[in-house]
């Protein structure tokens, strides 16, 4: 009998701490729920919206805008692009989208559209093209030192009048009184000629 009594006491001594721990764990959520309910009930009397938001998180405030996702088939943009709705914009501001066949395989958990939208590639004038290595070395042209001593010439056309004829005609006017001298001067006077001469002066 004494052996059985010691056996029961040792079993109870070993199991009592575990039973006590289980009872404490069960009591804690109940106390917290009572405190939360009491606290939320007090708030709900004054601010019912906050009470609903705390009870149902699906009605919580959404700080992010809901935008439609337009997947772009571009090797440089592998992530989804959030496009603004086109209906809000004026016709002048709408983007020109190219509809291309879907080349990305559809995942089993997501349904993808049959077509994908993509921005048109910018024109080459907007892209910066790096210079080639050959263009970095500028060649210095060889200059002829003999030709550089003379200034660059531009051809000009001038009309030259024979000045001897003009001088001789003045002599004719002066010698009208003397007929003998006038005949000699008239015989020696050539006709006035004009000629075009091309000069290379600057």
Curated annotation (Swiss-Prot):
Protein name, per record: Kappa-casein
Signal peptide location: 1-21
Predominant location: secreted
Modified residues (Phosphoserine): 148, 182, 199
Tissue: Mammary gland specific. Secreted in milk.
Function, in words: Kappa-casein stabilizes micelle formation, preventing casein precipitation in milk.
Gene Ontology cellular component annotations, sorted alphabetically: extracellular space
Keyword check for Glycoprotein: yes
Entry's Gene Ontology BP terms: lactation; protein stabilization
Chain positions of site Cleavage: 126-127
Gene: CSN3
Coiled coil regions in record: none
Highest taxon, organism lineage: Eukaryota
Keywords: Glycoprotein, Milk protein, Phosphoprotein, Secreted, Signal
Family: Belongs to the kappa-casein family.
């Amino acid at each position: 009998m004494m052996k059985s009594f010691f056996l029961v006491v040792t079993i109870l001594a070993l199991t009592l701490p575990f039973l006590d721990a289980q009872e404490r764990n069960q009591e804690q959520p109940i106390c917290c729920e009572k405190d939360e309910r009491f606290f939320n009930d007090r708030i709900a009397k004054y601010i019912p919206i906050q009470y609903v938001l705390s009870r149902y998180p699906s009605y919580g405030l959404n700080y992010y805008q809901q935008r439609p996702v337009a997947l772009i088939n571009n090797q440089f943009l592998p992530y989804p692009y959030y496009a603004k709705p086109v209906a809000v914009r004026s016709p002048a501001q709408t983007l020109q989208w190219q509809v291309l066949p879907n080349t990305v395989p559809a995942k089993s958990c997501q349904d993808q559209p049959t077509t994908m939208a993509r921005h048109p590639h910018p024109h080459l004038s907007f892209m910066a093209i790096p210079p080639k290595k050959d263009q970095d070395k500028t060649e210095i042209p060889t200059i002829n030192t003999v030709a550089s001593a003379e200034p660059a010439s531009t051809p000009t056309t001038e009309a030259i009048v024979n000045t001897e004829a003009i001088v001789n005609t003045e002599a004719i006017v002066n010698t009208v009184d003397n007929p003998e001298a006038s005949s000699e001067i008239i015989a020696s006077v050539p006709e006035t000629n004009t000629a075009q001469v091309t000069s290379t002066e600057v």
